[in-house]
From Swiss-Prot:
Species: Paramagnetospirillum magneticum (strain ATCC 700264 / AMB-1) (Magnetospirillum magneticum)
Sorted UniProt keywords: Amino-acid biosynthesis, Arginine biosynthesis, Cytoplasm, Lyase
Protein's GO biological process: arginine biosynthetic process via ornithine; L-arginine biosynthetic process
Subcellular location: Cytoplasm
PANTHER family, per database record: ARGININOSUCCINATE LYASE
Database matches in PROSITE patterns: FUMARATE_LYASES (PS00163)
Pathway the protein takes part in: Amino-acid biosynthesis; L-arginine biosynthesis; L-arginine from L-ornithine and carbamoyl phosphate: step 3/3
GO (cellular component) term, any one: cytosol
Main subcellular location: cytoplasm
Protein name: Argininosuccinate lyase
MF terms in GO: argininosuccinate lyase activity
Domain of life: Bacteria
Amino acid sequence: MTDTDKTKAASSMWGGRFAGGPAAIMQRINASIDFDKRLYAQDIRGSKAHCRMLVKQQILTEADGALILDGLDKVLAEIEAGNFPFSHALEDIHMNVESRLAELIGEAAGRLHTARSRNDQVATDFRLWVRDAVDGMESALKELVTALLDRAEEHAATVMPGFTHLQTAQPVTFGHHMMAYVEMISRDRSRLADARRRLNECPLGSAALAGTSFPIDREATARDLGFAGPMRNSLDGVSDRDFALEFMSASAICAVHLSRLAEELVIWTSSQFRFVTLSDAFTTGSSIMPQKRNPDAAELIRAKTGRVIGDLNALLIVMKGLPLAYSKDMQDDKEPVFEVADTMELAIAAMTGMVRDMTVNVDILRAAAGAGFTTATDIADWCVRALKMPFRRAHHVAGSLVKLAEGKNCGLEDLTLAEMQAIEPGITEEARSVLSVESSVNSRTSLGGTAPVRVREAVAGARRRLMDEAP
């Protein structure tokens, strides 16, 4: 079939009231096949479910139904073999599939669209695609959580500096730091699961907007396609893309979490920190400076977060002014969703690889944990417990000790007892026991705290939750 023939074929699907064909520029702006061909598997799956329902309801004959199902299998095989003749003249994946089906089986192909519009067809395809994307992303995030848990368990007692304002604050453990991201990514997975429950309703049978006069069985097609049930309102079924927005929103929040971890990896791998070393598999060199090991994977994850957020904003702006029901604006819903899914797939896989393969430089972390008077809060807490001092006064005492040590260019643990007692006479030699970074982290035994015993409990709890998930 020539392009001219295909243009005529496309027009024949909707052009009965037109005297002429579309302009060339109209064909270009109207065609979506370059991107929506990614929906081919979902489109064919939806068409097969629709066909089976039409046969069951005696709207199609069994003979026509068998022809259509066999023809759709052949179309699917051609696409997956790379032999399918995609055509811009046929506008979109739906018309491309239907046109090829007609070439293969003849007039029966035209009966497939009974009781169906491209409006509910594409809404169904898109929900199926997003559902698959959610499942794939959720599975990838589970692998990332597992990688983080492995490193957290390995380094439950590895001391490192904790930061606020990127200034050393209090000692924590590397395992505790990894578990913070386990919690964040676990919430990302929960958001995706929530989004999946809401998107798992079937719009097929909504037709153009008002439903159909044919005696269809929407429950049957919903079950066939694995949906929880049909959407309750036909206008809503073809009009909204909140399921796509929710997927993108959950992805954007997850991307922010990945970006924050990526930023920390960039900082931690710098020559000024050297907290971790990324494997050669996730770094690159310089074309001029032979010594360089650049954390490019982490930097690219950080950059790609902006693309995910931008795509979410783009679709929000597309949808914000659309009256019910379908508008052609909604053809532009797919590219941002596809890009978000592709970007997240790459970012999650790269982050999982970096976390699994990175070397944690334990000695450097330990040395850095004690710098910057990170146990100052511990001496204040000791004053509260041992001297029954109000915390605000204890805070002032600890601050004065820090000022003294800073002036002497030494650590808190290097101050003599006499020097400490000059600031607070009640301080005894026992106070020194709280000044080591190991003592500091071991004392943080409150629920969710950084004590190694709590970190190990948190790891075990997270692993149990993963095991308890439904398959």
